[in-house]
């Protein structure tokens, strides 16, 4: 038996630097990107980043990305996208999926590998299209086709296919963005949250207006020039409405609860959106060796999930409330309070969802009974919230939102010359992904 040989000691943790980001303009579904696939868009986003940082023919540690809505052909989406860029073919790539938290989760996963010294550089991101959605055959027809495929003889195959009825051919299974266990859409769930937290329609519309105004101002001052690659003729997000007013928003009818008590409209909810985004993360040594300045550092992160299915009303949580739990856990790890941030980037799936989360953090009973805190987290300075607009204005291609927010916040901190920013993203399935950037 050979003598035991100890392994080398684990290296010290390294800081995870965000060097830049790139996305294509986001487009409302069935508009500018109606014929673009997930691979088309993700490739364009990654290639734009490769071009900007002159990464042609370089082998990176890895590329991680994902999509929520995928065709079966996209089983290796990120790797196929990498092979379509000018990165070295030796760059490993893989898919991640955590609903709307996908883009941020890919950055956390690759960032952890950089911190541990397993890799030196990575690209993280996401993509989604609701235009090129995977339309499946009727479920009954699908089972018949599978049965026919299992048959060994021609007679057996014909016998199975004889069960096909004409109506099955004209009744495809269309994708629906709803919770499998409740049958409710995310918007319907958010309506329940808005009623529980007594979020007024006027407050939702005001948040939507601010999102459009802030995004329009960011475009006017050229903030996104080094964060975006034009695609299919688009130079900016086509959901942006610079001329929107409170009066226009107030004129819209509720879309998820059409009764007099409904408050969520097409104006204060994100539309189905197509798009892709990514960020470049690396160790400080890798960046320094190439003369690339660091925008910010990814320092803390947390994920959480809530029970939105409990039969007990007192125990059942709102579908999109998981970030309310994840943020205080992250704050405890970092030794910070909710007020210790210069920027708050809270993903605007719905205006009501943002306002529910903020109200929960201010509520003593909720913070005590649900979050296990001795005091409420308190309020934030709303002037620091989504200062360059967010999903209500630019749209929300599910898996692409996280990298969009990361790149935006990193650049904001670099422009400011330092500071700290909080990212909060709710996700389907009652999940939440949050992170902290510092400079």
Each model region followed by its residue ranges:
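Short, well-ordered amphipathic alpha-helical segments that serve as non-catalytic structural scaffolds
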Residues: 38-53, 77-81, 106, 186-193, ...
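Active-site pocket-lining segment
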Residues: 306-393
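N-terminal extracellular/periplasmic Venus flytrap/periplasmic-binding protein-like
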Residues: 6-7, 22-24, 34-44, 52, ...
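Condensing-enzyme catalytic core mediating Claisen C-C bond formation in acyl metabolism
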Residues: 3-36, 160-176, 250-321, 325-333, ...
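Flexible glycine-/small-residue-enriched beta->alpha junction loops
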Residues: 121-192
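Conserved catalytic cysteine-centered active-site region
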Residues: 67-122, 165-169, 181-185, 243-271, ...
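Conserved beta-ketoacyl condensing-enzyme motif
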Residues: 34-152, 222, 228-238, 339-361
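Active-site-proximal alpha-helical scaffold in enzymes
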Residues: 98-128, 136, 194-223, 278-285, ...
């Amino acid at each position: 038996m050979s003598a035991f040989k100890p392994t080398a000691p684990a290296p010290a943790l390294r800081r995870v630097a965000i060097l830049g980001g790139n996305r294509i303009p986001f487009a409302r579904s069935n508009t500018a990107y109606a014929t673009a696939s997930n691979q088309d868009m993700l490739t364009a986003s990654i290639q734009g980043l490769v071009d900007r940082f002159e990464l042609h023919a370089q082998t990176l540690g890895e590329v991680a990305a994902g999509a929520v809505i995928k065709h079966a052909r996209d089983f290796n989406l990120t790797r196929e996208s990498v092979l379509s860029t000018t990165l070295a073919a030796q760059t490993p790539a893989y898919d991640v999926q955590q609903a709307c938290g996908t883009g941020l989760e890919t950055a956390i996963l690759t960032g952890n590998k950089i911190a541990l010294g397993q890799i030196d550089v990575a690209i993280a991101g996401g993509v989604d299209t609701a235009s090129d959605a995977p339309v499946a055959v009727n479920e009954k027809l699908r089972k018949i086709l599978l049965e026919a495929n299992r048959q060994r003889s021609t007679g057996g195959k014909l016998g199975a296919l004889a069960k096909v009825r004409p109506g099955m051919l004209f009744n495809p299974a269309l994708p629906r963005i709803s919770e499998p266990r409740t049958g409710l859409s995310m918007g319907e769930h958010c309506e329940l949250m808005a009623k529980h937290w007594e979020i007024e329609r006027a407050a939702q519309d005001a948040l939507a207006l601010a999102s459009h105004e802030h995004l329009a101002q960011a475009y006017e001052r050229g903030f996104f020039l080094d964060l975006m690659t034009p695609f299919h003729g688009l130079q900016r997000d086509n959901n942006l409405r610079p001329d929107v007013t409170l009066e226009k928003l107030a004129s819209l009818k509720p879309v998820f609860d059409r009764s007099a008590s409904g408050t969520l409209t097409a104006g204060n909810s994100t539309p189905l959106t197509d798009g892709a985004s990514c960020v470049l993360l690396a160790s400080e040594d890798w960046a320094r060796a190439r003369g690339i300045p660091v925008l910010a550092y990814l320092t803390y992160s947390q994920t959480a999930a809530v029970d939105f299915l409990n039969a007990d009303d007192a125990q059942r949580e709102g579908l999109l409330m998981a970030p309310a739990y994840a943020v205080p856990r992250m704050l405890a790890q970092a030794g910070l309070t909710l007020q210790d941030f210069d920027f708050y980037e809270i993903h605007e799936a719905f205006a009501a969802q943002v306002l529910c989360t903020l109200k929960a953090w201010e509520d003593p009973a909720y913070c005590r009974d649900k979050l296990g805190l001795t005091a409420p987290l308190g309020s934030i300075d709303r002037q620091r919230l989504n200062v360059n607009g967010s999903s209500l204005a630019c749209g929300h291609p599910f898996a692409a939102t996280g990298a969009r927010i990361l790149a935006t916040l990193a650049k904001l901190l670099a422009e400011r010359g330092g500071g700290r920013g909080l990212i909060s993203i709710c996700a389907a399935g009652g999940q939440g992904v949050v992170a902290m950037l510092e400079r």
